[in-house]
């Protein structure tokens, strides 16, 4: 089992963890319906880039 040679200081520990945070997913707003959706995904109404691409129950 690996054991550290020297104790890591709080500063170095913080520097090591500096990039461990989560980023919020990028969302886009559909031009026709105004709904927010993940980029490069269709909106809940079945629209992608202003065009209807999937049939939904309401159609």
Swiss-Prot record:
SUPFAM superfamilies, alphabetized: Zn-binding ribosomal proteins
GO cellular component: large ribosomal subunit
A Pfam family it matches: Ribosomal_L32p
UniProt biased composition (Basic residues): 49-59
InterPro entries: Ribosomal_bL32 (IPR002677), Ribosomal_bL32_bact (IPR044957), Ribosomal_zn-bd (IPR011332)
Keywords: Ribonucleoprotein, Ribosomal protein
Gene Ontology terms: biological process: translation
Molecular function (Gene Ontology), one example: structural constituent of ribosome
Chain residue ranges for the region called Disordered: 35-59
HAMAP family registered for this protein in UniProt: Ribosomal_bL32
PANTHER family (UniProt xref): 50S RIBOSOMAL PROTEIN L32 (PTHR35534), LARGE RIBOSOMAL SUBUNIT PROTEIN BL32 (PTHR35534:SF1)
Family assignment from sequence similarity: Belongs to the bacterial ribosomal protein bL32 family.
Record-given protein name: Large ribosomal subunit protein bL32
């Amino acid at each position: 089992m690996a054991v550290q040679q020297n104790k890591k200081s709080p500063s170095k520990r913080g520097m090591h963890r500096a990039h461990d945070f989560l980023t919020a997913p990028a969302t886009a707003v559909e031009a026709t319906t105004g709904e927010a959706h993940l980029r490069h995904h269709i909106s809940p109404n079945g629209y992608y880039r202003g065009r209807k691409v999937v049939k939904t129950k309401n159609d």
